[in-house]
Regions:
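Short, solvent-exposed amphipathic alpha-helical segments in soluble enzyme
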Residues: 272-277
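Extended hydrophobic-aromatic, low-complexity segments
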Residues: 268-271, 284-285, 293-296
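Classical protein tyrosine phosphatase
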Residues: 265, 278-285
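Structural motif
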Residues: 16-18, 260-263
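A short acidic, Gly/Pro-enriched loop at the edge of an enzyme's catalytic core
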Residues: 9
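HKD-type phospholipase D/PLD-like phosphodiesterase module
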Residues: 1-2, 6, 21-253, 263, ...
């Protein structure tokens, strides 16, 4: 990824839950790319709750803000999405580590010019050094353009980060731009949802891909997305449902499938659909409890690994 960032000439966009507060090597790579390529524009999109959790101590926001100070907001953009589900007294009193359960920006899209890495990994040391995760590299201008529009669409519905020297600010300020197509989710959650739905709905249906010359390729890409709670519908649920239903019918029956998940919290409907396929063989790959990021943590979160293990046993 660092090599692709350094070679990028026009654009880099990075959508992730958060960037580790000690990822100075990644920031140094982005800085070098901006210095070497004067036409390069870099856009970061993270989650607000997770990206500012440690404030006023170092956080994703404080790590990224100096890039804006150095290269200016026209070349470096840092946006942080905030769920409209967490406002008022709920936001004030729910502990920070728990409040993320009310909604997050969870896309992992790492685009450089006309290539994109679609991943499940955040940009932090644990994921770089101690996690097994998916990294799919696509060399496709059409696909990279499409997800750039998704990234930009959510960025325009997010808070803007700027550097700040104010005492206790943690090195950054977070404001809601007047140019955003929706009011702040903290000021008017219902109007935010309504405006956000209008802004994002057209992006769920990409334009038809241009016809291509016949080839031996057997790979077809179907982008599926879930923008809950911004939209009441998603393309993720119907697409996965259709695929699983198809596996239970001829000529795909009996089929072979592999189900992978870091956290085994399969919904009842997906569980029924998977079991209904009566596969020739089925493989479930999930994390061992000791490999779970919540293993050994204090409070309710420390109970999650055992809960996922229980769900896996129930499935078997």
């Amino acid at each position: 990824m660092q090599d692709k960032i350094l070679k990028a000439q026009r654009r880099v966009y990075l959508s992730t839950l958060y960037i580790g507060k000690t990822e100075h090597e990644l920031i140094s790579t982005v800085r070098s790319a901006l210095q070497n390529n004067p036409d390069l524009h870099v856009s970061f999109l993270t989650d607000s709750l997770r990206g500012t959790r440690e404030t006023p101590d170092p956080s994703s926001a404080s790590l990224l803000a100096p890039l804006i100070a150095e290269f200016g907001p026209r070349r470096v953009e840092v946006r942080m999405y905030h769920t409209p589900n967490l406002t008022g007294l709920r936001k004030k009193y729910i502990p920070k580590r728990i409040n993320e359960g009310w909604g997050l920006q969870h896309m992992k899209l790492y685009g450089c010019d006309d290539e994109i890495i679609m991943s499940g990994a955040n940009l932090s040391s644990d994921y770089f050094t101690n996690r097994q995760d998916r990294y799919h590299l696509f060399r496709s201008k059409e696909l990279t353009d499409y997800f750039a529009r998704i990234h930009d669409g959510i960025a325009k519905l997010s808070f803007d980060i700027q550097p700040s020297n104010a005492e206790g600010a943690g090195g950054y300020s977070m404001t809601w731009p007047s140019s955003n197509p929706a009011p702040s989710p903290l000021d008017s959650p219902s109007k935010y949802r309504e405006s956000a739905a209008k802004h994002m709905s057209h992006l769920l249906t990409p334009a038809n891909s241009p016809p291509t010359a016949s080839s031996s390729s057997t790979t077809t890409i179907y982008p599926v997305l879930s923008f809950v709670p911004l939209l009441k519908t998603s393309t993720e649920l119907p697409a996965l449902t259709k695929i699983l239903q198809s596996l239970a019918t001829a000529p795909l029956h009996p089929s072979t499938w592999t189900f992978t998940a870091g956290y085994f919290n399969m919904t009842p409907s997906f569980r029924r659909l998977l079991l209904a396929t009566r596969p020739a063989s089925g493989t479930v790959l999930t994390a061992h409890p000791h490999a779970n990021g919540f293993f050994g943590s204090k409070g309710v979160s420390g109970m999650l690994p055992a809960a996922y293990t229980h769900l896996a046993k129930t499935f078997l």
